[in-house]
UniProtKB/Swiss-Prot annotation:
Keywords: Ribonucleoprotein, Ribosomal protein, RNA-binding, rRNA-binding. One of the primary rRNA binding proteins, it binds directly to 16S rRNA where it helps nucleate assembly of the platform of the 30S subunit by binding and bridging several RNA helices of the 16S rRNA. Forms an intersubunit bridge (bridge B4) with the 23S rRNA of the 50S subunit in the ribosome. This is Small ribosomal subunit protein uS15. It comes from the Bacteria. One of its GO terms (molecular function) is rRNA binding. One of its GO terms (cellular component) is cytosolic small ribosomal subunit. It holds the Pfam family Ribosomal_S15. Belongs to the universal ribosomal protein uS15 family. Part of the 30S ribosomal subunit. Forms a bridge to the 50S subunit in the 70S ribosome, contacting the 23S rRNA. GO terms for biological process: translation.
């Protein structure tokens, strides 16, 4: 259910702006998106897991705040990020 270390490294390489970049909003959004996808798969099998559903809503809200921040700072980076991640907005 959690992200493997290999997958996390792939995401870091793909979205990092610098070599050792782990804290940029793009990387954070990519990691949150991966966790949200994993939880969404979990809910296909465990529909009544309300405890994890609350965690999912928390992750979605956190991702939304980070995306709003990126959009406020640089619209082009925001558009590139949502295009790369395949998000709807």
């Amino acid at each position: 259910m959690s992200i493997t270390a290999e997958r996390k490294q792939e995401l870091l390489k793909e979205f990092a702006t610098a070599n050792a970049d782990t804290g940029s909003p793009e990387v954070q959004v990519a990691l949150l998106t991966e966790r949200i996808k994993n939880l969404t798969e979990h809910f296909k099998e465990h529909q009544k897991d309300n405890h994890s559903r609350r965690g999912l809503l928390k992750l979605v809200s956190q991702r939304r705040r980070l995306l709003d921040y990126v959009k406020r700072k640089d619209e082009a980076r925001y558009q590139a990020l949502i295009e790369k991640l395949g998000l709807r907005r």
